[in-house]
Swiss-Prot record:
GO terms for biological process: negative regulation of canonical Wnt signaling pathway; negative regulation of retrograde protein transport, ER to cytosol; protein localization to endoplasmic reticulum; Wnt signaling pathway. Interacts with FAF2. Interacts with LMBR1L. Interacts with AMFR and VCP. This is Ubiquitin-associated domain-containing protein 2. The gene is UBAC2. Restricts trafficking of FAF2 from the endoplasmic reticulum to lipid droplets. In association with LMBR1L and E3 ubiquitin-protein ligase AMFR, negatively regulates the canonical Wnt signaling pathway in the lymphocytes by promoting the ubiquitin-mediated degradation of CTNNB1 and Wnt receptors FZD6 and LRP6. Its main location: endoplasmic reticulum. Keywords: Endoplasmic reticulum, Glycoprotein, Membrane, Signal, Transmembrane, Transmembrane helix, Wnt signaling pathway. GO terms for molecular function: serine-type endopeptidase activity. It holds the Pfam family UBA. The lineage of its organism: Eukaryota, Metazoa, Chordata, Craniata, Vertebrata.
Length: 344
């Protein structure tokens, strides 16, 4: 929607699809047909602490009672489906589970801190819904998704491929009085889980037997078919020319982004990716349709690509041709090729 992910829709993202459909349907059902049942899904930490209503930690943190929160969180989950394609459904579910559990602890700590330092007790009634894991996903989104400048406005300000996602997150952040507590808890839990602090990723994870069980039972229900008609960039006469145009377009975007930010291209070992080293063949390749009488340069022998890495990229939802092009351009670096494809 806002970020390009290689293929549209929810292909290879059954968990994201279930998180879009089930909570949204239940939220609409409670708002339109069963408003008298909404009290059962109120996220009331005061009732949890004083009345030992532990079940509210589950019911109050799954379904949104505010429809605009449902809409914003659904849009964010749709865009964050790229992590399910990258990590796989089991690791993605483990991240959501870990951040969901940790955020409940951080909610309690923040509420107690507000009551102790500021005497604010009304904050014990927090917004309901699956919101904290959505905010937690901003941590890997910020750290692992490359920033590509799309346009520049008002001098130093620029619009990137990530700008609209941050704006949508800000809209969700400001949608309620105390939702900032849930947002901070989600960001803290995402940071703890993503950085593997205290080995929480090994404790709060989905067991393999459970992942297999759900893959046999629920995954066929929420799985989506592979898109057959993708809109292609460029007007090349053949698929090879179209793929070449797509690669060259992304190369130009990356170069423009680095130029606008004032970065100088230099080779570093173990540091930032040197795009001039990875992508010069894309700019130097010339097709017979665009030569205009000039002689083409001698073609370099094709780089051998690992079939295992091609298979992993295809499991994320990318086509075989795009996976081969990205792996050749990135010198068989799977991480660079994945980030490359996620931006196109």
């Amino acid at each position: 929607m806002f970020t390009s992910t290689g293929s549209s829709g929810l292909y290879k993202a059954p968990l994201s699809k279930s998180l879009l459909l089930v909570p949204s349907a239940l939220s609409l059902l409670l708002a339109l047909l069963l408003p008298h049942c909404q009290k059962l899904f109120v996220y009331d930490l005061h009732a949890v602490k004083n009345d030992f209503q532990i079940w509210r930690l589950i019911c109050g943190r799954i379904i949104c009672l505010d429809l605009k929160d449902t809409f914003c969180s659904s849009l964010l989950i749709y865009n964050f489906r790229i992590f399910e394609r990258r990590y796989g459904s089991r690791k993605f579910a483990s991240f959501l589970l870990g951040s969901w559990v940790l955020s409940a602890l951080f909610d309690f700590l923040l509420i107690e801190a507000m009551q102790y330092f500021f005497g604010i007790t009304a904050a014990s009634n927090l917004p309901s819904g699956f919101l904290a894991p959505v905010f937690a996903l901003f941590v890997p989104f910020y750290c692992s998704i490359p920033r590509v400048q799309v346009a520049q406005i008002l001098g130093p300000l620029s619009i990137t491929n990530k700008t609209l996602i941050y704006i949508l997150g800000l809209q969700l952040f400001t949608s309620g009085s105390y939702i900032w507590i849930v947002a901070i808890s989600g960001l803290m839990s995402g940071l703890c889980y993503d950085s593997k602090m205290f080995q929480v990723h090994q404790v709060l994870c989905i067991p393999s037997w459970m992942a297999k069980f759900f893959s046999w039972t629920l995954e066929p229900i929420f799985s989506s078919s592979e898109p057959t008609s993708e809109a292609r960039i460029g007007m090349g006469a053949t698929l090879d020319i179209q793929r070449q145009q797509r690669m060259e377009l992304l190369d130009r975007q990356l170069m423009f982004s680095q130029f606008a930010q004032g970065r100088r291209q230099r080779q570093q070992q173990g540091g930032m990716i040197n795009w001039n080293r990875l992508f010069p063949p894309l700019r130097q390749r010339q097709n017979v349709n665009y030569q205009g009488g000039r002689q083409s340069e001698p073609a370099a022998p094709p780089l051998e690509v690992s079939e295992e890495q091609v298979a992993r990229l295809m499991e994320m939802g990318f086509s075989r041709g795009d996976a081969l092009e990205a792996l050749r351009a990135s010198n068989n670096d799977l991480n660079v090729a994945t980030n490359f494809l996620l931006q196109h």
